[in-house]
């Protein structure tokens, strides 16, 4: 029984890392999407390269760079390093999700708002973003699912970082049996299945 609790404690840490990472990713992603719509050529190039780099480099390598180079000696908390690493990685995907959600709307709405004298930030915040949320939410849930699976490398990349993977590895080392890994896989599968059902339900409700 204590072994199952140990695995569930690892799962709870994994969920926390995922949630905080996606939350940071959404904040940074919204900022990136907003900056992109300022139509500044230099800013556009910087953001495009930022997105391409983060989407092109495996998340494991990114986490290693953050842990042992960029944040080395600056932040001691492995949990915080993981959140920052995954959050920055997620921001590249979230910014594209938001951009796609905004571009799916009728461009005439922004033009009408601007014609009425609304400043660009106000038009985005009060008219465009609220409508785009309908298209964005299901995709954000899918991003949460993707990041949830990607966090499985945390226990392997960051030394002694406790999460579901680390918990299963610790139990496997104790008993020298494959069951802990199998249980971890089953837990990941069940969680992803539940998240996917939630995403599908949310998408159907938003389409009504």
Task: Identify what each model region corresponds to.
Residues 1-208:
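Transmembrane alpha-helices and adjacent helix-loop boundaries
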């Amino acid at each position: 029984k204590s072994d199952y609790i140990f695995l569930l404690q690892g799962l709870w840490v994994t969920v926390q890392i995922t949630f905080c990472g996606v939350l940071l990713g959404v904040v940074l992603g919204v900022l990136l999407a907003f900056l992109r719509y300022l139509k500044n050529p230099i800013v556009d190039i910087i953001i495009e390269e930022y997105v391409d780099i983060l989407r092109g480099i495996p998340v494991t390598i990114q986490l290693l760079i953050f842990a042992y180079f960029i944040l080395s000696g600056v932040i001691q908390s492995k949990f915080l390093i993981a959140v920052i690493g995954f959050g920055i990685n997620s921001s590249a995907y979230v910014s594209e999700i938001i951009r796609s959600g905004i571009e799916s709307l009728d461009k005439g709405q922004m033009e009408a708002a601007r014609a009425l004298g609304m400043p660009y930030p106000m038009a985005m915040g009060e008219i465009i973003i609220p409508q785009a949320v309908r298209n964005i939410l299901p995709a954000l849930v899918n991003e949460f699912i993707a990041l949830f699976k990607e966090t499985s490398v945390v226990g392997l990349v960051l030394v002694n970082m406790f999460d579901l993977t680390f918990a299963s590895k610790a139990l496997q080392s104790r008993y020298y049996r494959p069951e802990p890994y199998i249980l971890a896989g089953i837990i990941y599968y069940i969680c992803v299945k539940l998240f996917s059902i939630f995403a599908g339900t949310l998408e159907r409700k938003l389409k009504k």
